[in-house]
Structures are given as structure tokens and as C-alpha cells.
Amino acid sequence: MKTKYILLILTAWLTASCSLQEDTEGFSTPGDFYKTKTQCQSAVNSCYIPLKNLYTYKMMIATEGVTDLMYIASGTQDAQLDISPSQPRFGADMWTYGYRGVMYCNMAVTGIENSPIDEKDRNSLVAEAKVLRAFYYYLLTSFFGDVPFYTDDVSDHEVLDRVAKLPRMSAEATRTALIEDLESCLGALPLIRTSEAAGNRA
């Protein structure tokens, strides 16, 4: 009788034990994203995020604060002397968030171009991401002149390694490439003011 109860308890315990294998529900990969217009729109929305970190008082200091047009008093040192190659401060933010924006745009362009959504929507969203990418590169070339230029989605270590070793491309060549890229988008975006576009989009 005792053996019966032990076997019954053991069987109940084995059938009630938890499984270590879980179905992931809240994690997306590029392979299972970009399936709907909403997902593609979300990817383009993410391209705007770095702008809020670029357009702060730091941009004012990095552009006007180092010229004769503005003097910024500092309690410890002249703020003009606070920006240098050895201590880039706000320049480092421009570089970091500028390239973060480029990375988001490249990811969105690649993902949406391979998306099964309606062609008109796809072309419009790709064009919007390309406009934002061009804007980020415009800011980068305005601040730093010659910068590394790439349009690849940094989706794996091989691409990341190649992009990390890119030399600087001349600002003129970068802007020429951007103009060609933007000209390819002309038919995909509405010819209206941004304030009249849905959601004030590009």
C-alpha cells in the first residue's frame, strides 16, 4: 500500500514538473519583424529617436559656443576651451547619436525593402528612412567634414567588423551619394509641407 502511494506521488510530481523550454513571445528578430505596415512604421519611428539627443543645448554649445558669436561663462573654465580633440564632450554626442540615427535608418531601409507590405506603403516608408539617414549624414559632415559612410544594415559581426574599419569618405562624396539617394525617393513622398503630412512626418 505504501509503495502505491509513493508511486502515485512520484507520478504526479513528474507530470507536474516544469519544462525548461519556453516559447518566447516578447522578443522579435529582423527575420520575424517587418511583416506588417504597423511594424514597418514602428521601425521608421525609431529613426527619429536620436534627434531628441542631438537637438539640445549641447548642439548650441558645439556650434555657436566655440565661435566669436557666443561666450559661455563657466564657473571653472572658459567653456570655449572645454571642447578639444582630447576632450570632445559635445562633439562626441554629435558623433554617437548621429551614427546611431544612421544605424537605425539603415536597419529600417533594409528591413522594409524586404517586407511583404503594399508596394506604395513600402516605397513611402523606405523614402522616409532615407531622408532621415541623409539628414543624419548632413549633420555629421557639417560637424566633422569627412566621415565614414555606409548604408549597410549592421546585422551581424561580419558587417560590424567591416563597417568599423571603414576610412573617412570626403564630405563632398558623401553628400553627392546622399543627393543621388534622395533623388531616388522623389516620387515616393508627398510634395506637401511637413506640417500638412500625417503625423508631421518627413
Regions found by a protein language model. Name each.
Residues 1-29:
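Bacterial Sec-dependent N-terminal signal peptides
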Residues 18-63, 97, 107-109, 172:
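Acidic, glycine-rich segments characteristic of secretory precursors and extracytoplasmic regions
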Residues 23, 141-153:
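Short, well-structured active-site flanking segments
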Residues 23, 63, 67-69, 146, ...:
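Acidic side chains
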Residues 31, 57-78, 150-152, 190-202:
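Short, surface-exposed recognition loops and adjoining beta-strand edges that mediate ligand/DNA contacts
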Residues 37, 41, 49, 75-144, ...:
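Conserved, well-structured interaction surfaces
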Residues 151-156, 182:
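Short, small-residue-rich loop/turn micro-motifs
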Residues 155-163:
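Short glycine/proline- and charge-enriched loop/turn segments
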